[in-house]
């Protein structure tokens, strides 16, 4: 159980939430674990198979406390809301902001700043921890290039300009990503991003990680009451969860890229986990995907201190916290959207 931003998170799959007077009671195997006064909550997000009692769901609906139900793996399932306090006002503000270049740019600026900041920190972390095994000069040059882009991002007032700066930062970052790979260079060498299809094992894992992260971000946005299909940086396209792609930008370097690098550098993955097709495409096979998912779930259970909130939580909660912060900004509770800055 974790209470953050006036949101109660039930993170264990066997937690059952019930109502007792004015309190939410968390139970496991009919044993009471904790109590939370209803009047202190704005929303409840449950990742439990056990879920919530009908009485609690009804009282939350009466009081306008949003309830989101997700699977233990983070897939959004359903939402409970009352007659008059759904997400219409929040979504109307989201749509208004998405239609306004300046409003969209204000949010996108923060997200791109977070992405470049985290990309640079990933490079600096490798320099610090493995300085004798890498080309320090190449990493330093890339780090400086990205650092010089950060104030430009904060000053940029157009979405196209932000996309250009993001592209420059990505070129600098991916230009040295191979330096961050420390083991099994024969199988896991990186010569640049290739998509649709990925042409080497590193790109196969990056693409797979991005697709999982996008799914997690879409579920987090749904749970926060936002429309994952209407973004600020990524514009509308049928079937594309544009806001999920926006939200994951700042999380790519620290959640997806570092995860892939850890799998490689810890020798978790090897050549037999991939299929090489006649077209040149390289994909994870069934065993590789199962292994990937297992370690991804382990990663999501690892702990960290959220840099903005100063609270300890699991990595898997980060997209949900960022989605809640974005919703708070759109409601006018925050002056700006605070991106996740990895430290």
Q: Residue ranges of each PLM-predicted region?
A:
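Terminal-proximal segments
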Residues: 1-72, 82
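Active-site helix-to-loop segments that bind/position phosphate- or nucleotide-bearing substrates
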Residues: 1-20, 29, 35, 87-343
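A surface-exposed, charged beta-strand/loop segment in the N-terminal or early-internal portion
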Residues: 40, 48-121
